[in-house]
From Swiss-Prot:
Keyword field: Nucleotide-binding, Nucleotidyltransferase, RNA-directed RNA polymerase, Transferase, Viral RNA replication
Uppermost EC category: transferase
Domain RdRp catalytic: 561-676
Role of this protein: Probable polymerase.
KW Nucleotide-binding (keyword) present: yes
InterPro entries linked: DNA/RNA_pol_sf (IPR043502), Luteo_Rpol_P1-P2 (IPR013674), Rev_trsase/Diguanyl_cyclase (IPR043128), RNA-dir_pol_PSvirus (IPR007094), RNA_pol_HCV (IPR002166)
Superkingdom of origin organism: Viruses
Family recorded in the similarity comment: Belongs to the luteoviruses RNA polymerase family.
Entries under CDD domains matching the protein: Luteovirus_RdRp
Record-listed E.C. numbers: 2.7.7.48
Entry protein name: Putative RNA-directed RNA polymerase
Catalytic activity, reaction form: RNA(n) + a ribonucleoside 5'-triphosphate = RNA(n+1) + diphosphate
GO MF, one annotated term: RNA-directed RNA polymerase activity
Length: 867
């Protein structure tokens, strides 16, 4: 009964048990061996287990195989000689001749002829007897030689009373013979598995016909020098399966193999059948198949895909065989799976861009040496193999950042400067928008400086209180507007060459002047933009639930909607002096405050210094957005929305805008799509390089701020892309012990669960993190320290997880958005549901995760990190 438990155990456990019994408990070892012989051949499912056990018991070395072959030959010769002598003796005595002859014929394997009835002489018997004695002597000498070989190779204890030489050599011979049989069987299976599949191309069994759509078009033809107009039906090309048995068979094979190629785990459950139907629909739409062909392919696929073929069954048998499992276990050991799980570390990167040597940048020595850690830490089990790194705080990276992010826009060795806007274009085309915003905003009050200081966390709060005290004794002056820049320590997905970004803050004294006016009135100004557009436009002030509903409502306004993604390449760098003055005109129009106007004027000319390593960089730039300014986000939204509104007005189109600063999506009717072809040239007049993305015609394919709309229980919600799993598995925070790691996992998980309740895959991932953290409680301050600014915007203060079931409808919508079909979703969720993420700190740099990004349809170059 005890031995039967081993049938379900792992290969490693069984082998460890056999080794222990052989070395310590020989009686149990032989009982186990006898039990294996008893169950062998009784049940096919157990034969693989028996073979695996005997294979481990054998543990054959190369020298034994040669000895076993020679021993088998000698033993056959001895048995043949002994049976022949026995036959001759029987013939001499005339008793038992038939039995002796049969035995001899069997032992000689029919290879030696001996008459059945004859009377051998004494001399014949003596000759045969001498031959047998000689063979026995040679066999004995061989056994002595073999025993010495075993002592030399395996030591004295290997051949003993429990494991005699002859039994061992016979076992080796049997195992080798079985291995040869298995090799022949494997070759047969291999030939069957690797035989080419006869799948015809779609175009060979389909034909294209033109059919009338029911719509008419006006056609103008010239006849006898005069134009004649008449209506003609609009024709459309439709593909259909040929009406032959051969074509239908070919189509059946094609659709079955096509769907299995996309997902080989589909079976006959409700979700699988829905997935199969959607795959057929997608294929039909792609190749413009008629409804009859789609229906036929759906019927065929629903029957053929869920039923495994003999090849599928054999493939599964090979993959799950004891030998295959044993080899995978050995690879796991070599890869240190289980030993390298935990929080690993990756060092920072140096930008590959060369230094241009711009004369505008002055580098001086003598600064205090600064050492900043640029390591990034990631959870080895969940990072999906996506490589995130942070830039080193080096002189090279600093120079690249200043040259490529402040002065030039090119990627090569030549200095290419940003385009300049046309003279007075902002005033000429956007003056109406500026006045409309000022009118909508109305009165805005200036808030107390103490309130501004108290809105920051402890460290910054003390600095602001100090600045407030300073302003009471020393009035604001221009030097307060000077900028001290530093390299932004952020996660970069290393899919392309990257130039690090800069943060360019001014003094706390300066920020108090702007913050008391602008920070607390930002929402009011953003709502004014919504009022001018006539619908919610700046979506950064909404959580992902509300954003999804707003975008869906915008989409439903149009009969045939299309979404055009727009991204302003390095927006801050392209904000010109003219754009800044236009933006400042709005603030001055709202507040009418001379102190604010003076501070805003000091944003036009920027004196910047930067400390890195033991160097100080100085440079000066006119115009450009300083990313550390309090009005950075609001100003970018005002400029972008103003330009877009003026563009819509110029085109005379009805369109909806989704804006979050430099990231925009235009939603309009498909009939207006061509009108936006000149967008790049239009915005170039304003000094901006505007990059348009490929238009999308399905709501789930609309991407905004690295998220897409997914219908969760019938309500659209903005859901982050699957690669967010890899990003949330990395942190820039210092982790000193396992408690820190668990706090980090808990903070990420709690926020992730709020945003992704009821979302396929993502909910399971964040539940996995939360469970692995031990459901650790963390402070609100720690949560804000861990999560990114973008995540905090999506949350909008939410902290409560609402348990939401994952429905089939949600799974199908998630598939439409991200290309991960429902069955793959379930597989990934099972992986996370059974995973415990280790909080162990590891010193290794790179490990390969169990779950790779390819399973989640994450393209290698899908990144919004600009170079």
């Amino acid at each position: 009964m005890f031995f039967e438990i081993l049938i379900g155990a792992s290969t490693k456990a069984v082998k460890d048990f056999i080794s222990h019994c052989y070395s310590r408990l020989k009686s149990i070892y032989y009982c186990f061996k006898r039990w294996l012989m008893e169950i062998s051949g009784q049940f096919k499912a157990h034969d693989a287990f028996v073979n695996m056990c005997f294979g481990h018991m054998a543990d054959i070395e190369d020298f034994e195989a040669e000895l076993a072959e020679e021993f088998a030959e000698r033993e056959d010769e001895v048995e043949e000689a002994r049976s022949l002598l026995k036959l001759l003796v029987a013939q001499k005595s005339k008793t038992g001749v038939t039995e002796a002859w049969t035995d001899f014929f069997t032992k000689s394997r029919g290879g030696v002829y001996a008459p059945l009835s004859c009377e051998p002489t004494r001399q014949d018997l003596e000759v045969k007897s001498e031959k047998l004695e000689k063979l026995l002597e040679e066999q004995h000498q061989f056994e002595v030689r073999a025993a010495k070989k075993y002592i030399k190779e395996k030591g004295r204890g290997f051949i003993n009373c429990w494991n005699d030489l002859r039994s061992r050599l016979r076992l080796v011979k049997d195992v080798k013979d079985e291995a040869k049989d298995n090799a022949r069987a494997a070759a047969k299976i291999g030939a069957e598995m690797f035989a080419p599949v006869d799948v015809q191309d779609l175009y060979s069994f389909t034909e294209v016909k033109k059919v009338e759509t029911g719509l008419m078009k006006e056609v103008v033809k010239e006849r006898n020098g005069e134009e004649e107009k008449h209506l003609e039906p609009i024709m459309e090309e439709v593909r259909s399966i040929k009406d032959t048995a051969e074509a239908r068979d070919a189509a059946s094979t094609w659709i079955t193999e096509t769907i299995k190629l996309k997902n080989s785990t589909l079976n006959a459950d409700e979700l699988s059948l829905a997935t199969i139907a959607r795959y057929v629909e997608n294929v039909g739409d792609k190749f413009k198949l008629d409804i009859a062909s789609k229906t036929y392919l759906k019927q065929v696929a629903s029957m053929s895909v869920p039923i495994p073929t003999n090849k599928d069954i054999k493939l599964k048998m090979v993959l799950q065989s004891p030998e295959a499992r044993a080899r995978r276990e050995r690879m796991d050991v070599l890869d240190s799976v289980g030993f390298l799980e935990g929080l690993c570390t990756a060092s920072g990167f140096e930008s590959p861009f060369p230094i241009l040597g711009l004369p505008e940048i002055a580098v001086t020595d003598g600064a205090r040496l600064r050492k900043v850690s640029c390591n990034i830490r990631y959870l080895s089990q969940t990072h999906l193999g996506l490589v995130y790194k942070a830039p080193n705080a080096s002189l090279h990276n600093a120079l690249v950042a200043v040259e490529r992010r402040v002065y030039t826009v090119g990627k090569g060795d030549k200095a290419i400067y940003p385009p300049r806007p046309e003279h007075d274009i902002f005033t000429d085309t956007m003056d109406y928008f500026q006045k409309s915003i000022i009118e909508e905003v109305g009165y805005c009050k200036t808030y107390p400086a103490q309130l501004l200081a108290n809105s920051y966390s402890a460290g910054k709060r003390a600095m602001y209180h100090k600045a407030i005290a300073s302003l009471r004794t020393i009035p604001y002056h221009q030097k307060d507007a000077n900028v001290q820049a530093f390299l932004k320590k952020e996660k970069h997905w290393m899919t392309k060459d990257i130039a690090p970004r800069l943060i360019c803050p001014r003094s706390k004294r300066y920020n108090i002047i702007l913050g008391t006016r602008l920070k607390f009135n930002e929402k009011k100004i953003m709502h004014a933009i919504d009022s001018v557009f006539g619908s919610p436009t700046v979506l950064s002030g909404y959580d992902n639930f509300k954003q999804g509903r707003i975008i869906a409502k915008k989409w439903q306004k149009f009969a045939c909607p299309v979404a055009i993604g727009v991204d302003a390449s390095r927006f801050d760098q392209h904000v010109s002096e003219q754009a800044l003055k236009w933006e400042h005109g709005i603030y001055n129009g709202v507040f009418g405050d001379s102190e604010l106007a003076l501070a805003l004027e000091h944003q036009i000319t920027n004196n910047i210094k930067m400390f890195v390593e033991d160097k100080m960089l100085r440079f000066k730039v006119r115009g450009h957005r300083m990313s550390g300014d309090i009005n950075t986000s609001m100003g970018n939204k005002l400029i972008m929305c103003g330009m877009m509104h003026a563009y819509f007005k110029k085109l005379g189109v009805e369109a909806e805008l989704c804006n979050n600063g430099d990231d925009c999506v235009i939603i309009t009717d498909r009939a207006n799509e061509k009108l936006f072809d000149g967008m790049y040239d239009h915005f170039l007049r304003y000094g901006f390089n505007m990059v348009t993305e490929k238009p999308v015609y399905e709501l789930e394919q609309l991407e905004f701020c690295q998220s897409k709309p997914v219908s969760i229980n019938g309500k659209y919600r903005m859901v982050r892309r699957p690669d967010s799993i890899g990003k949330d598995s990395t942190t820039l925070l210092s982790m000193l012990n396992q408690s820190d790691v668990k706090s980090y996992m808990s903070a990420v998980a709690q926020c992730g669960l709020v945003l992704n309740a009821g979302v396929p895959i993502l909910e399971s991932f964040y539940k996995c993190l939360y469970r692995s953290s031990g459901y650790k409680k963390v402070s609100e301050e720690f949560i804000k320290n861990v999560i990114s600014y973008g995540t905090d915007e999506r949350l909008q203060g939410r902290r409560t997880f609402q348990d939401t079931p994952i429905t089939n409808h949600s799974r199908m919508s998630y598939w439409e958005s991200f290309g991960v079909d429902p069955k793959i979703q379930q597989i990934v969720e099972r992986y996370y549901d059974n995973l415990t993420v280790s909080a162990q700190l590891q010193s290794v740099k790179v490990t390969t995760p169990h779950l790779q990004s390819i399973l989640l349809s994450i393209p290698e170059n899908h990144s919004h990190n600009e170079y």
